[in-house]
Regions:
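Bacterial N-terminal signal peptides that target proteins for export
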Residues: 2-11
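N-terminal signal peptide c-region/cleavage motif recognized by signal peptidases
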Residues: 19-21
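Histidine-rich, glycine-flanked metal-binding segment
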Residues: 34, 38-77
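Polyanionic/metal-chelating signatures
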Residues: 124, 129-262
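Glycine-enriched alpha-helix->loop->beta-strand junction motifs that scaffold or abut catalytic
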Residues: 256-262, 280-286, 314-316
Length: 392
């Protein structure tokens, strides 16, 4: 079957996936629309794609000797980015033998990297692109160790290379239930974390002595020291999973002495209380807007409009699903909940696309010349969960 016949067939099936970046030939996407106000159709747009990148975009773009793709009047957006999920690391939440996302019974797991355990054949992965999620940050979870290890960036679109970046960020857990390994006190947990970072800093300073076995002994393994060294040098982001405002404030102030550490707050149920401080220091917050119930003493300040407060203050935000056991559509559902509670529609879309791309320091997330052609086509409002994705 010729390529054009294949495209026409795809246009008839809302559940069929079409990976534009995987096409070697130049493609001209016609009859598409940019998102307008509140999810309505905006300006008509034609997009020229070559070698998986947007070469030109606008109302007057034309090209010869290209394959043509009729978007059928659909709204086009960049693919969504899930800023925190464990898909590919587990299949069944209650079955321990299917979970590979955490290291148990160790004091420090900073050297663990989830990409070594990722299963690109997971039964859960095909659900991601059907909800417009084309990339995801796969995060480790914590057992007794507060430092849980490094996350990885993956692509969910069939035909693309699955692993996009093997080592993206280090993850540190300091929530109410993450204090067992520190004797039951979150205060001691933070002190131990700072001591580990100090030890990693000494490891970086004493490399020559260490290599010649002349350095004072370290309590951490070489793998953990190197992983934390990457954080100290700013080579890896540090994602701190924490909810209580008092804890967030202590984390921010405690890490100020590590000048190159790049902090991100994940969860941040009470981060809205510190919005001016976080905005001033340009510390991003990764939110699960649906996680808004005050189910613990860490979350007494939970509220539905936290994304609105943070965004209005100028805090960079992005949305995450946090678990693979619910539909990826929870990302768009979260965006819709945020809009219903005051977040501007365009800012909600940004928190799924350009926002996370900037926070994670990865390309894409924008419809612009030179960007990766990571395109998703919708038959209506891109954050309305009752509408369908047409193509990806």
């Amino acid at each position: 079957m010729k390529m054009m016949d294949g495209l026409r067939s795809i246009a008839l099936l809302a559940t069929t996936l079409f990976a534009l970046p995987a096409i070697a030939a130049d493609v001209l996407v016609e009859n598409a629309f940019l998102p307008g106000a509140e999810g309505a159709k905006g300006e008509p747009v034609t997009i020229l794609i070559s070698e998986g990148r947007i070469q030109a975009i606008g109302a007057e773009v034309t090209a010869n000797d290209v394959e043509r793709f009729d978007a059928g009047g659909a709204i086009v957006t960049p693919g969504y980015i899930d800023s925190g999920t464990s898909v590919g690391l587990a299949e069944v939440s209650g079955l321990g033998t299917s979970r590979d996302g955490r290291v148990e019974e160790v004091r420090n797991a900073a050297g663990f990297n989830v990409w070594t355990a990722l299963n690109e054949g997971s039964s859960l992965i095909p659900f991601a692109p059907t909800d417009g999620v084309t990339r995801g940050v796969i995060t480790p979870s914590a057992d007794e160790a507060n430092f849980a290890g490094e996350s990885a960036l993956v692509r969910f679109v069939k035909g693309d290379k699955f692993l996009a970046r093997a080592s993206l960020a280090q993850h540190l857990y300091l929530r109410e239930w993450n204090r067992r390994g520190a004797g039951g006190s979150r205060g001691n947990a933070l002190q131990v974390v700072l001591e580990d970072l100090d030890e990693a800093a000494r490891f970086l300073r004493d490399q020559r002595q260490y290599n010649s076995n002349k350095a004072r002994p370290f309590s951490l393994s070489t793998r953990e020291l190197r992983a934390l060294g990457r954080v100290i040098k700013g080579e890896r982001l540090l994602v701190v999973h924490v909810d209580r405002a008092a804890d967030i404030r202590k984390v921010v102030s405690s890490f100020e002495r590590f000048e190159d550490v790049k902090l991100i707050i994940a969860g941040g149920v009470e981060a809205w209380r510190l919005a001016p401080m976080l905005a001033e220091q340009s510390i991003p917050v990764l939110l699960n807007v649906l996680d808004n119930v005050p189910e613990s003493f860490d979350r007494l300040g939970a509220r539905l409009d936290s994304a609105t407060i943070l965004d209005k203050a100028g805090v960079p935000i992005a949305f995450m699903s946090t678990t693979p056991y619910s539909e990826f559509r929870s990302l768009t559902q979260a965006a819709g909940v945020a809009v219903a509670n005051g977040l501007r529609w365009d800012r909600a879309l940004r928190a799924l696309t350009e926002g996370p791309a900037e926070i994670w320091g990865i390309e894409g997330g924008r419809l612009a010349e030179g960007e990766v052609a990571d395109l998703v086509f919708w038959d209506g409002d891109p954050i309305e969960i009752m509408l369908s994705l047409i193509h990806i």
